[in-house]
């Protein structure tokens, strides 16, 4: 959320074919819930393209990068590193400390995609568990970002959007930005 030091999300590992949807959702969740950028492994080409496309259509700012240097990204990070793992300290025990640190330092959130090596646990400033139960890494990322931003990410605006969702009790209403608020809603299924 551009008003604080940077928050970046690093997807650590990607198995093409098996992880495509989950890796894409890590990027979409990072964008929607306030991170400034996502870094994907170099082999996550389709996920990177999809998240860039969504950012182009629904606005940013949000950057998408690919890297072959996952470990170097962690080691060279200029701020603090938070590794999300079900084995870590309970989120509710450390979220205040992480939030306070984020006022001064950028945060790199590491989200595993396959077995994460012990080096990542050692390099992290915090290994954080959201419930310490097995569940989706996307759910863990969403809860963590909401705690980090204290819910402010839910009110953020998006710049340079081509399309915008109009919240409604029932149905789907997506407008082209140049048409303004009076544009006809998108057909069912559009904008998914």
UniProtKB/Swiss-Prot annotation:
**A cellular-component GO term for this protein:** cytoplasm
The family note in this entry says:
Belongs to the aTrm56 family.
Role: Specifically catalyzes the AdoMet-dependent 2'-O-ribose methylation of cytidine at position 56 in tRNAs.
Under Enzyme Commission nomenclature, its number is 2.1.1.206
**What are the binding positions for S-adenosyl-L-methionine in this chain?**
84, 112-116
Describe the protein's quaternary organization and the partners it interacts with.
Homodimer.
Classification via PANTHER family = TRNA (CYTIDINE(56)-2'-O)-METHYLTRANSFERASE
Q: Name the InterPro entries for this protein.
A: Alpha/beta_knot_MTases, tRNA_m1G_MTases_N, tRNA_mtfrase_aTrm56
Q: What is catalyzed by this enzyme?
A: cytidine(56) in tRNA + S-adenosyl-L-methionine = 2'-O-methylcytidine(56) in tRNA + S-adenosyl-L-homocysteine + H(+)
Q: Subcellular localization, per the record? A: Cytoplasm
What GO MF annotations does this protein's record show?
tRNA (cytidine(56)-2'-O)-methyltransferase activity
Name of the protein in question? tRNA (cytidine(56)-2'-O)-methyltransferase
> Which SUPFAM superfamilies has this protein been placed in?
alpha/beta knot
| Predominant cellular place of this UniProt entry's protein | cytoplasm
Q: Which Pfam families match?
A: Trm56 (PF01994)
Q: Which domain of life is it from?
A: Archaea
**Record's signal peptide:** none
Q: Which UniProt keywords apply?
A: Cytoplasm, Methyltransferase, S-adenosyl-L-methionine, Transferase, tRNA processing
**Which biological process, per GO, is one annotated for this protein?**
tRNA nucleoside ribose methylation
tRNA processing as a keyword of this entry, yes or no, is: yes
């Amino acid at each position: 959320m551009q008003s604080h030091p940077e928050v970046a999300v690093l997807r650590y590992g990607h198995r093409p074919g098996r992880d495509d949807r989950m890796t894409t959702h890590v990027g979409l969740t990072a964008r929607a819930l306030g991170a400034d950028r996502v870094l994907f492994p170099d082999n996550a080409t389709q996920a990177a393209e999809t998240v860039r496309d969504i950012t182009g259509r629904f606005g940013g700012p949000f950057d998408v990068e690919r890297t072959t240097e996952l470990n170097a990204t962690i080691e060279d990070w200029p701020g603090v590193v938070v590794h999300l793992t079900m084995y870590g300290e309970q989120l509710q025990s450390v979220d205040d400390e992480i939030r306070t640190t984020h006022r001064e330092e950028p945060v790199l959130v590491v989200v595993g995609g396959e077995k994460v090596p012990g080096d990542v646990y050692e390099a992290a400033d915090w290994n954080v568990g959201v419930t310490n139960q097995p569940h989706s890494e996307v759910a863990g990322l969403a809860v963590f970002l909401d705690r980090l931003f204290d819910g402010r990410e839910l009110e953020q605006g998006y710049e340079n959007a081509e399309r915008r969702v109009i919240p409604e009790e029932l149905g789907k209403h997506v407008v082209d930005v140049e048409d303004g608020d009076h544009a006809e809603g998108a057909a069912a299924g559009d904008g998914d």
